[in-house]
Amino acid sequence: MRVDGREVRELRHVHIHTNYLKHPEGSVLIEVGDTKVICSATVEERVPPFMRGEGKGWVTAEYAMIPRATEQRTIRESSKGKVTGRTMEIQRLIGRALRAVVDLEVLGERTVWIDCDVIQADGGTRTASITGAYVAMVLAFEKLLQAEKVTKIPVKDYLAATSVGILEEQGVVLDLNYAEDSKADVDMNVIMTGKGHFVEVQGTGEEATFSRAQLNELLDAAEHGILQLIEKQKEALGDIVSHIE
């Protein structure tokens, strides 16, 4: 039994509140246990200069935490005048993951801005951001479809992410909270599509190593969790699912 009473292959409670914000084309509040992230999707009728004239769109992301998302207040990065390496890595990861399942040609010469703002952090903020951002993005695409700006919702598959790790007492566990993540021997983030294809795997031994057999066990646990997360996405999207499947 884990610190919060879950089984080793059990996700935290997941809830996705759609249309959480008034102004964006798509928005959600995703809750994964005590981690809460607001994800919004904004559509601009232009692309970055390097994409002009190619007839394709672009998806990019920004990520941030409010100061008291964590136990101790952190200084806003805007106050520091620069984005940290961690933040840059996460927002590139989010954009890269989403682009893997978007049909950029169907999107046309538009940019989708994904903004992920962590309002409470208890581990897994980047994976929750990806899972929530996918839903926000599809909601924005559905508005483009309603406005007849696209011929179909420009996504090729579902996309979700979770964390897995190895704890000394429990072995391989799914969806680590902060207390577990801070003492894990191995920590891994996994992004997968609905068809079971990997988009990205980030795994690190924390003063420890892991075997090929453990790697397979980690990936199996991640897939188990991601398939459940995709079902949560489908529930949140409702009738829009018929335009994806």
Swiss-Prot record:
Its EC number is 2.7.7.56. Transmembrane segments: none annotated. It is an enzyme of class 2 (transferase). Phosphate binds at R86, G124, T125, R126. It catalyses: tRNA(n+1) + phosphate = tRNA(n) + a ribonucleoside 5'-diphosphate. PROSITE patterns: RIBONUCLEASE_PH (PS01277). GO terms for biological process: rRNA catabolic process; rRNA processing; tRNA processing. Gene3D superfamilies: GHMP Kinase, N-terminal domain. One of its GO terms (molecular function) is tRNA nucleotidyltransferase activity. Keywords: Nucleotidyltransferase, RNA-binding, rRNA processing, Transferase, tRNA processing, tRNA-binding. InterPro entries: ExoRNase_PH_dom1 (IPR001247), ExoRNase_PH_dom2 (IPR015847), ExoRNase_PH_dom2_sf (IPR036345), PNPase/RNase_PH_dom_sf (IPR027408), Ribosomal_Su5_D2-typ_SF (IPR020568), RNase_PH (IPR050080), RNase_PH_bac-type (IPR002381), RNase_PH_CS (IPR018336). Phosphorolytic 3'-5' exoribonuclease that plays an important role in tRNA 3'-end maturation. Removes nucleotide residues following the 3'-CCA terminus of tRNAs; can also add nucleotides to the ends of RNA molecules by using nucleoside diphosphates as substrates, but this may not be physiologically important. Probably plays a role in initiation of 16S rRNA degradation (leading to ribosome degradation) during starvation. Belongs to the RNase PH family. Homohexameric ring arranged as a trimer of dimers. NCBIfam families: RNasePH (TIGR01966). PANTHER family: EXOSOME COMPLEX COMPONENT, EXOSOME COMPLEX COMPONENT RRP41. HAMAP family: RNase_PH. This is Ribonuclease PH. It comes from Bacillus cytotoxicus (strain DSM 22905 / CIP 110041 / 391-98 / NVH 391-98).
